Amino acid sequence: MHTDEYEISLAREINVCIRVIKQTQMKLAQRQQLFGMDLPQASKALNEGRLVIERQELADWRDDFEALPQWEQRLEQYREALATMRISASRF
């Protein structure tokens, strides 16, 4: 069943996802620029003693790295739900 409230809620969730994805991408890019490498390279460099980084900074970097695909997947699911809702609403 389609209602404006459902569509508004899905649109709101889509906007949240987009905002979080952009912020996360920006943080990942800033860290990559700061350290001159991406997370997998940084982890390797740390294990080899070629990188000094605070434990919390590395944990935050890893959290963002792992969260990004989850947010992207969530965004796709919301977009699909909204598209399905609009298709089913157009049948009535």
What do the predicted segments below correspond to?
Residues 70-92:
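Long amphipathic alpha-helical coiled-coil segments
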Residues 29-55:
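Short E/K-rich amphipathic alpha-helical oligomerization segments
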Residues 1-13, 46-49:
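Short, charge-rich amphipathic alpha-helices with coiled-coil/heptad character
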Residues 18, 22, 50, 83-86:
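Generic secondary-structure transition motif, activating predominantly at the C-termini of alpha-helices
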Residues 6, 42, 78-81:
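Generic structural signal of hydrophobic/aromatic residues within well-ordered alpha-helices
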Residues 10, 14-24, 28-31, 61-64, ...:
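Amphipathic alpha-helical coiled-coil segments
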